[in-house]
Amino acid sequence: MGEALALDASVVVKWFKRGEEREAEAMSLRDGVLGSRVSAVTSEWLFLETVRALVKVGYPHDKIKEVYSTLRELTSLGFIEAVPVGAALDKAVEIEAALSLYASDSVYLATAIIRGAKLVTEDRHLLREDVVDYAKREGIEILSLAEAQL
């Protein structure tokens, strides 16, 4: 397997919703995951967060079910490791308290830290300077899609 990258929903949703900013970079990353050039890891919350994002923009219900099924299949086939929230919970609580992040953002960052993977995100909260500095102190990088190209 290739480089270890942790993915959040702000990246993965671009695999399914066309016309998004940085769509080409997201699709390149998806191809890297499917081609085993990237060892992808995420929180199991990715499923819910991706569904929520698609519901929010009015994506058709049947298509949302397909997206969910596709993501479940990618994890069951080993293309993406979905880490249980409980495995990252203690670190996520520490992060949330230290950085005043949303719970889901804290879980994504904690997952990246415990797996020693670079976190790829388009989430502005996770790209804040203090969050990036915290991640560096924890031994990982936080990258935008533009910075994470294979």
Regions found by a protein language model. Give the residues of each.
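Alpha-helix capping/helix-boundary segments
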Residues: 11-12, 46-47, 88, 107-108, ...
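Helix-adjacent hinge/juxtasegments
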Residues: 54-83
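A short acidic, often aromatic-flanked loop/helix-cap motif at beta-alpha or helix-coil junctions
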Residues: 48-49, 88-90, 145-150
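Acidic, PIN/NYN-like endoribonuclease modules and their adjacent C-terminal/linker elements
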Residues: 2-4, 78-81, 109, 113-150
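Acidic catalytic patch
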Residues: 44-46, 72-98
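Short, well-structured N-terminal submotif of metal-dependent ribonuclease cores
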Residues: 1-42, 56-66
